[in-house]
Amino acid sequence: MGTTSSQSKTLYQKLYDAHIVHEAPNETPLLYIDRHLVHEVTSPQAFDGLRAMGRPVRQPGKTFATMDHNVSTQTKDINASGEMARIQMQELIKNCAEFGVSLYDLNHPFQGIVHVIGPEQGMTLPGMTIVCGDSHTATHGAFGSLAFGIGTSEVEHVLATQTLKQGRAKTMRIEVNGTVGAGITAKDIVLAIIGKTGSAGGTGHVVEFCGSAIEALSMEGRMTLCNMAIEMGAKAGLVAPDDTTFAYLKGRQFAPTGEQWEQGVAYWRTLKSDADAQFDTIVTLDAADIAPQVTWGTNPGQVIAVNQIIPAPESFSDPVERASAEKALAYMDLRPGIKLTEVAIDKVFIGSCTNSRIEDLRAAAAIAQGRKVAKGVQAIVVPGSGPVKAQAEAEGLDKIFIAAGFEWRLPGCSMCLAMNNDRLEPGERCASTSNRNFEGRQGRGGRTHLVSPAMAAAAAVSGHFADVRELSATTH
């Protein structure tokens, strides 16, 4: 290797190195944190810790809060999701007022899921470090920012010092080349990736997604991709910023303006992996091979194309995978050898920080239009934020959903996780656009299948999983 190669860096290494505040021998480096996003579930103990030590929030202007995990999606009443939820939301209101942190509370027009509102308001910018007490913070990596989830004690540390100890991760490049077929979305791409790597394939790595199929994605598609980097075990996901990124950000509330914007873009254009940068792991996929994906098991790596058969445990050579498949099939009440298109569903959830943005809702509405939700199926659509809801209503998407028999709800995390009133009953089967199909994730005993918004809408109107490509081809 020549001298140039030893100097060349991946995008992750550039972001990491630019934020080192202090690095002592044999110590984990201390990184500066540019943005800290806060929600009601992982912050109360952190603020209590500051109060006990008499510390202020060091940079209230770099800290933004909202309530999302346990809000009701049917009313703006703070009491609607039960006592624990009410206490957490009231604590957040009190803490933000006391410590001078801006809060998008239940009645704020911009309230919504933290990972939807950050990018939407331009709080998320390329080149930043971004943390939140939430595992899906990786979403913001779509902008070429180093974004990851942290625990509650770390939330307190960032509030107090605006820094965090963070070791270097390994690097992984996932390249998706070519063009996807009709009806294939970012959700299908990322589920296909996790199907290939497995749910632990990215452990210890920061993943950079690249290739022509990734460059062709909108910012919302890239957010879906990075949102689920965590589901392959990765620390964070990244997409290098480009003209698509800059066009999305220009004019947003917290985006720079004028000369600062020009300077920002000039710097952001340098945020890409050098041509000869070395990655620890490289994974490649051909976009043309990707079909609509549906998970069959209890981790996102247990996934197949909608037209494939559910695998038999014996088909796995690894004994751990075989045992995991056996357990998953029993929990999910599925038989190997059949197709998921033969499997009936009870509920459909379109929403979450993975798939609740305007393009997601448009894709679902295109399938719902002129059709009806199947008898016996409850289908809910939960926009990711106030602005997404307002835009969808301006475009008449709410009317399409309501006419088809879907419920049109208020913004929040909703049925992605059983922390509010939207949940599965034991044994209920759900086609969900969220990111985790773990046992009990959507409610104790609930069975979750992860799909794209269009696939979720197709399941809702069919009463079972269906290949969206066949529905798209038929007239209503």
Swiss-Prot record:
Name of one Pfam family that matches: Aconitase
Any Gene Ontology biological process: L-leucine biosynthetic process
Top class in the EC scheme: lyase
Residues that coordinate or bind [4Fe-4S] cluster: 353, 413, 416
Keyword list, A-Z: 4Fe-4S, Amino-acid biosynthesis, Branched-chain amino acid biosynthesis, Iron, Iron-sulfur, Leucine biosynthesis, Lyase, Metal-binding
Catalyzed chemical reaction(s): (2R,3S)-3-isopropylmalate = (2S)-2-isopropylmalate
HAMAP family: LeuC_type1 (MF_01026)
NCBIfam families, A to Z: leuC, PRK05478.1, PRK12466.1
Family: Belongs to the aconitase/IPM isomerase family. LeuC type 1 subfamily.
Name this protein carries in UniProt: 3-isopropylmalate dehydratase large subunit
Organism (species): Yersinia pestis
Taxonomic lineage: Bacteria, Pseudomonadati, Pseudomonadota, Gammaproteobacteria, Enterobacterales
UniProt gene name: leuC
